């Protein structure tokens, strides 16, 4: 029986999180314009992604997330930062070795106001050579007992800059002047 279960757990594809949580997050959380730009790349596996919400110090407690996304109005960019080891994204499947992008949840700060935790589409590795971008720490945490094919990993940011459009905008927007607009029920984001 042990051999049977070992075999069955190995049937999960290393890109399972890409085709499930990552793709569905973009379909549900991205604006129509963002989805039109990213989904063809995702569907053709030109972008490989993961869903990075869980943090070491908070598990899946979204309210406790410490990773920050601070809006730089002058440059129209987000500065993504991991302020402590507790804020490292930890365990996301497909993150350790495969992902080039991550749907990452971070606490949104605009003009010193905390607007809560929102999702971002963040490039973490080059699609050309698969190396992490400067300001991104990413790696594999080793095998998971009984789930060897899943490459769980860790992710941290050191004042990593991404374009304003990295914020997934179906339910929220921050314009170039830093005005925050929520569309619909914020519970739909999680």
Question: What does each of the following model-derived ranges do?
Answer:
Residues 1-46, 97-98:
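Internal helix-loop-helix
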Residues 25, 53-60, 86-88:
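Sensory/regulatory domains in signal-transduction proteins
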Residues 32-36, 59-64:
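Fold-level signal for large, globular catalytic cores of enzyme and receptor domains
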Residues 46-53, 135-139:
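Short Pro/Gly-enriched beta-strand edge/turn motifs at strand-loop
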Residues 73-137:
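A short core secondary-structure module
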Residues 142-190:
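Glycine-rich beta->alpha junctions and the first turn(s) of the following alpha-helix
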